[in-house]
Amino acid sequence: KEAASIAASAPLESELRALVDGDVFLSIDNLCAGYGKMEILHDYSLRIGQGQSLCLIGPNGAGKSTVLHSIFGFTNIFSGSIKVDGKDVTRLTPSQKLSEAGIAYILQDKSVFPQMTVEENLLMGGFLKDKPVEAKAAAEMVFEKYSRLADRRNKPAGVLSGGERRLLEISRALVMQPKVLLVDEPSIGLEPRFIDMVFEILDDLQRKDGKTIIMVEQNAKKGLAFADIGYVLVSGETAIADAGDKLLENPDVGRLFL
């Protein structure tokens, strides 16, 4: 009820736009989406610029993961649109979103195959490449970037630490060289020291590689400290939108989510 009380006046499109640095790269407009016939998101809108990061926070069941699922094509879209770099991608399949629009989805914990080697897990990220040699070349670029994976490339992924497994999950998405990373609960199930490592990796991907990152994170304090933009979702709608550091200072957000 308290969360609903702060959602009385949803931010205007102009307010969402004001948080974007430069041109809008990915936009959602008046999206109604859900699962089966159940609508979870109601006239939902979002704006983010290229190379920016956005963190979605809110109570359980607010629709945070549904936003990521809708962008990637895992939900039923009843109305509204999703655009990337001016291209309408609303009705593309997940594989088309990855190969044509450069959108990669990084799953929650436990998507690594423990019996397969680190390299085999990584190569699975390139399954949409036209030629196996292209996936191999992209995987080598990942190994050059992350020595802790390169050192274990021929070992079963099951021997990796929790933080290294999360690094492998992120790296597998990089094989398709995406522009947009959808990251679902990067800190889930990790010890604090590995959480810091994962956020450092994501920060590097944004700052140095120019990736656009949209994240759902239950650790709201960590997510908002990382992100340029923060949205608070309540009942399938954005209740508050502001710069990440401003939301950290917002007393309502602090009382309810931090």
Where are these regions (language model features)?
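Conserved ABC ATPase signature
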Residues: 156-160
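Conserved ABC transporter NBD signature motif
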Residues: 80-88, 99-101, 134-139, 144, ...
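ABC-family P-loop ATPase nucleotide-binding domain
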Residues: 1-32
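ABC-type ATPase nucleotide-binding domains, specifically the catalytic core motifs of the NBD
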Residues: 36, 76, 118-137, 145-147, ...
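ABC ATPase C-loop
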Residues: 173-174
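The feature captures the beta-strand-to-loop junction immediately N-terminal to the Walker
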Residues: 57-59
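Helix-to-loop junction immediately C-terminal to a conserved catalytic motif
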Residues: 72
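Helical segment within the ABC ATPase nucleotide-binding domain
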Residues: 196-210
